Amino acid sequence: MCGRFTLTSNLDELQGRFGFLSEFTDSHSFDHGPWLGPRYNIAPTQPVLTVTNDGQRRGQLMRWGLVPFWAKDLKIGARMINAVGETASAKPAFRAAFKKRRCLVL
C-alpha cells in the first residue's frame, strides 16, 4: 500500500465490474455519500469502499489502516499502511491479517 490513492469510478460502475451487493441505496446520503464517489486524495484512516466475500460479495466502507492484534492504541492504524508484498506473510504485524483477513480495496 502507499500513503495516498485515488478512486476514479462511481458506485454503479464498481458494482457492475465486481458484482457485489451493496447496503448503499443512495450514494449521496449524509452517512456515506462523500466516501462512495470518485476521490483523488484518499488518506489513511479515511473510510474506503471495500469488497468482502463471506459466501457472497458485499460492498462496505472500512477505515483504511491496520490495527495489529497486539496494539493498545487504535491510532497505530494510521501508521500501519505500508506492507511489502514479499514479506507481509512473515512480519508479525501483518502475518495474521495477510493469511485470514482479506478484502479488495477499491
Q: Residue locations for each model-derived region?
A:
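Short linear sequence motif anchored by a di-proline
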Residues: 1-106
